[in-house]
Amino acid sequence: MIDQEYILLIMNCKKYEKKSLFQKMTWLKKIPSYLKYYHVIGDTAMETEYEFDNENNVLKVRVADDYNSLPKKVIASYIAVNNTFNYKYIFKTDDDQILVNNQYFDLLCNLIKVKEPKTHYGGFIVDVKQPYMSEYHRIHPELPKQLPLYITKYCSGRFYFLSSEAVQYLILKRANIEREFLEDYAIGFNLSRTLKESILLISTNKYFTDIELSDFPKLVEEGKI
């Protein structure tokens, strides 16, 4: 096992490789040295369940590389980290996010270290007070139109973190998570109440912005990335 206290997993896919390249060109160059990151992509043709490419900061997992398989990709990547590293926390974000505050991870890690009781989960909290049908298929037409969300609290997929204890609990819920379509909801819904008692609220919109609001579209159009 490799000692690595903090690991950042960025959900990516081959189709959007340019987004990962732009992230590497910009904010990922400035993250703290104590933070190891991987872009996570799926590949059903793999012979093994997962493979770390440390030279290119890529984690490949044996799942489909499409949007509907995102819950499968996420839990597979957590299993890969759990089997490979001695870690304290996993941070998760997406390939369409840009970090706009270079002090973010220092601030967050310092806060996590001193928080009592220990926090196992954090991010921008979505509080589902009544069951409802998701309208997310209007943004991602590949999603089912009948997609119920039940009463729970979960952290938005833009960015959230999980302790090693939370990850190990979620691994036991892998089958349940893989049946879902919305990754962030699947994680929060399947995490135990005990591990959600001290969720750390983070105003992630103050620290992250969408990649489409950056120079990324212009650089793609100009063929510079």
Language model features: what each stretch is:
Residues 8-10, 37-39, 153-161:
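Conserved, well-structured core segments
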Residues 39-88, 102:
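Active-site-proximal specificity loops/subdomain of glycosyltransferases
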Residues 3-6, 32-36, 86-88, 116-121, ...:
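Loop/turn elements at helix/coil->beta-strand transitions in domains of secreted/extracellular proteins
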Residues 195-225:
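PAPS-dependent sulfotransferase catalytic core
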Residues 20-24, 51-54, 72-75, 103-106, ...:
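Short coil/turn segments at secondary-structure boundaries
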Residues 71, 93, 97-189, 193-194, ...:
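Conserved catalytic core of nucleotide-sugar-dependent glycosyltransferases
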Residues 1-21:
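N-proximal low-complexity "stem/linker" segments adjacent to membrane-targeting elements
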Residues 22-35:
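Short, acidic, metal-binding catalytic loop of nucleotide-sugar glycosyltransferases
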